[in-house]
Structures are given as structure tokens and as C-alpha cells.
Amino acid sequence: MSKIQRVAEANLPTEFGLFRIVGFEFPDTKKEHVALVMGDISNSEENPVLARIHSECLTGDALHSLKCDCGFQLSTALRQISEAGRGVLIYHREEGRGIGLINKIRAYSLQDNGMDTIEANLALGFAADERNFKVCADIFELLGICKVRLLTNNPAKIDTMKKAGINVVERIPLNVGENRYNTGYLDTKAKKMGHYIVHDNEKHYLDCPYCQSEIPNKK
């Protein structure tokens, strides 16, 4: 596979402010990824860029599913970049941890019948995580970024960036969106994938609008 190329860009006004949307494409496969850029991201050597690698999740990002934390993480990351006035969000187009949308729906069906997110992937013949984060390092390079402050709970993203020559000088936690539909999913990511997920179940029951009917009875 040939290396990804920067092919298009334009202004993109959003509810979080004005971004530049930059399109990237593999010339042979035509596989596409995009980055949202705010502010002056030059000179990352002296001033590391606030960054988020966000893998595509149609159900969470666009359809507001509560089965995952993806949509919450997307909006929180864009808001934090906007508040900082400078940063990058790479929209990494590997839906369903790399298995695609239809297979993700199949995995959801297996989860409806008792499997966790990892068991469902394995039952369908996939690895727990099929994503390739190396392309994100290539995108950072094409944007002229060498040092980042990375918004993530996923150690694999940090490890891949460092191995590819992108210096992650700080990890910024992104623990948002926990609710009664995704607590088990988040537990699985923490226990089986090593994600840095912090639970405060009592607090999330009290704060989450979807959980008010399920506040545990205190003895």
C-alpha cells in the first residue's frame, strides 16, 4: 500500500468554532481520512499540539447511540480544542474498531445475547481491535506536527505514535459519557484492552440523565 497523501482542504464552521477540514487519501485504495484543524499548529516542537485520534463510529457520532462513549468523546474533544484555540482532531475512518459498520451491527447482535465487545469480535473471526493507527502518525507528519498532547484513554494510540516518531508529551484523559447502556463495554475495554478508564459508578448514576430510574438503593 502506498503512503497516504494530503489531497484537499476547506473551511468548516461547526458548533465548536471554525476549523479547517483537511482530506487525506491513499492513491491506490482511495481510502479516506480527515483532520479538523483549529488555529496555528506550526512550531509543535516548542508548543505541542492538543490532539485527538477519533476512530469513526457512525452509531455514536451521528446516531447518538448510548452503547459506547464515542459520540461523547468526539464532542468533548472538539470542545476542548476550541477552548484551547489550537489543535487537531484526526477522524480515523476505521468503523467498528476496523471491522466495518455491518460487522459492527453483527457484533452488537452477539452482545445483545450476552457476549462482551471483545468476545463478539472474536466470534466473528476478527481480532479484538483491527485498527491501524500508523496512518494517524503519517497524517500528523503531513500536518507538520511532531509533538502532541493526546486526548485519549487508549494506550495503543500512544504506543503507535511514539514508535512512529510522534512525541506524545502528555496524555489527557477523556472519561465521558458513561451510562447504564455502556458501563459493561467500558469495563471490558479497561480490563481486556488496558484502556485508562476511570469509573465512578455512584456519581454517574446520580449525574446521568439516562440512569435516574436505576439509582441503587443505599442501605
UniProtKB/Swiss-Prot annotation:
Its EC number is 3.5.4.25. Pathway: Cofactor biosynthesis; riboflavin biosynthesis; 5-amino-6-(D-ribitylamino)uracil from GTP: step 1/4. The keyword Hydrolase applies. GO terms for molecular function: GTP binding; GTP cyclohydrolase II activity; zinc ion binding. Pfam families: GTP_cyclohydro2. CDD domains: GTP_cyclohydro2. It catalyses: GTP + 4 H2O = 2,5-diamino-6-hydroxy-4-(5-phosphoribosylamino)-pyrimidine + formate + 2 phosphate + 3 H(+). InterPro entries: GTP_cyclohydro_II (IPR032677), RibA (IPR000926), RibA-like_sf (IPR036144). Binds 1 zinc ion per subunit. Zn(2+) binds at C57, C68, C70. Catalyzes the conversion of GTP to 2,5-diamino-6-ribosylamino-4(3H)-pyrimidinone 5'-phosphate (DARP), formate and pyrophosphate. HAMAP family: RibA (MF_00179). This is GTP cyclohydrolase-2. It comes from Mannheimia succiniciproducens (strain KCTC 0769BP / MBEL55E). The lineage of its organism: Bacteria, Pseudomonadati, Pseudomonadota, Gammaproteobacteria, Pasteurellales. The gene is ribA.
